[in-house]
Each structure stands twice: as C-alpha cells, then as structure tokens.
C-alpha cells in the first residue's frame, strides 16, 4: 500500500490536499446547528443514489408510469425500500434546508462578505423545491396528475404571457405525455446538473471565506 500511496503522492501531492482539508480552522462558537447544511447534502446524496437505482425500472409514459412504480414496490427486490428512502429523504432534505436557511439568517451568515454564498444557497433552495414539484408527479397517480395540473396552471394568472408559459410547462395545452416527459427530464437531468454547479460554487465560497463569526 505504501508504494501505491507514494506513487500518487509523487504525482498529485495528495498529502498537501489532505492537510489543507483537515487543518481548516473551525470557530469555537460552532455547534450542532452548523451541521444542517451537511445534513441537507447527505439527503441529496441519498436522493441521487436511490433515484439512479429507480431509473432502471421507472418508465416515463402516461400508460406505464404508475404500473412501473407499482412493479418496483411489489416485485423488485428491496424496491420498496429504495423508493421509500427516496421519498423520506426528499422530505428530510426540504426540512434540513429550511432549518439551514433559518440558522444562516439568524446568525447573520448572509452578511458581507458572504452575500454570494447566500445567493447560491437561495438558488439551491429553489432547485430543491423544484425537485419536489417535478418528482411528486412522476408516479402519475391521481395525486401526481392533479398536482401537476394545478402547478402548471398557476402561471395562467400572469397577464399577457400566462397562457404561453402554461403551454411551455405542459408541452401542450393540456397535461399529458409531453408534460410527464418534461418533468422527468427536469427531475433527472436538468435540476441535478444545476444543483451540482451551484453546490460546487456554494462549497468553494464557504471554503474560501470560512464559517461566519458569532453575532
């Protein structure tokens, strides 16, 4: 093992990287509430793992979406566990995110020079809610269908462009296959990529600026 380590150390200086990570100063006022962001990230990683596993069985069509979820829950080995973990970690992620936002706000973590960290965090919050909205409809049961219809119908109230926005979201004048395809694409590709980009920016800024001091 030492030869393998030395080989990588010679080329990548991995010890310097490890020292930089482990030697970062942590202020004495930090407590368990400062772990809420990390708990949100943990829930996100569970979402990625379980969501990836479910893509092997889920079929994003109005005719087969519900039956594929039913098959996953009743026939696939541990399918019920994977979907349940996905569902409950999604709820936990939203809860941890809300608590994290409150902690940052109440401790003044959004103030100069951490404004951009706060902005990227707010964007990540919007993306998290978007995950919930798009994922809720994917089983295409009665609850998912009507939730999709209501959510995509909200922009109708916007003057002039409301109808166009509704049609853009639905892919048609009414909710159907095009809507499900859009939601599936957003949920499994667009939103994860955007989340990873803003998470990277968020973490790099935290790493650069450190944890905010006490009020």
Curated annotation (Swiss-Prot):
Heme 1 (or BH or b566) is high-potential and absorbs at about 566 nm, and heme 2 (or BL or b562) is low-potential and absorbs at about 562 nm. Heme c binds at residue 35. Heme b 2 binds at residues 86, 187. Belongs to the cytochrome b family. PetB subfamily. Pfam families: Cytochrome_B. PROSITE patterns: CYTB_NTER. It is a multi-pass membrane protein. Its cofactor is heme b; heme c. It comes from Cyanidioschyzon merolae (strain NIES-3377 / 10D) (Unicellular red alga). This is Cytochrome b6. Its main location: plastid. The lineage of its organism: Eukaryota, Rhodophyta, Bangiophyceae, Cyanidiales, Cyanidiaceae. The chain crosses the membrane at residues 32-52, 90-110, 116-136, 186-206. The gene is petB. InterPro entries: Cyt_b/b6_N, Cyt_B6_PetB, Cytb/b6-like_sf, Cytochrome_b_N_euk/bac, Di-haem_cyt_TM. Component of the cytochrome b6-f complex, which mediates electron transfer between photosystem II (PSII) and photosystem I (PSI), cyclic electron flow around PSI, and state transitions. Binds 2 heme b groups non-covalently with two histidine residues as axial ligands. SUPFAM superfamilies: Transmembrane di-heme cytochromes. The 4 large subunits of the cytochrome b6-f complex are cytochrome b6, subunit IV (17 kDa polypeptide, PetD), cytochrome f and the Rieske protein, while the 4 small subunits are PetG, PetL, PetM and PetN. The complex functions as a dimer. It is found in: Plastid, Chloroplast thylakoid membrane.
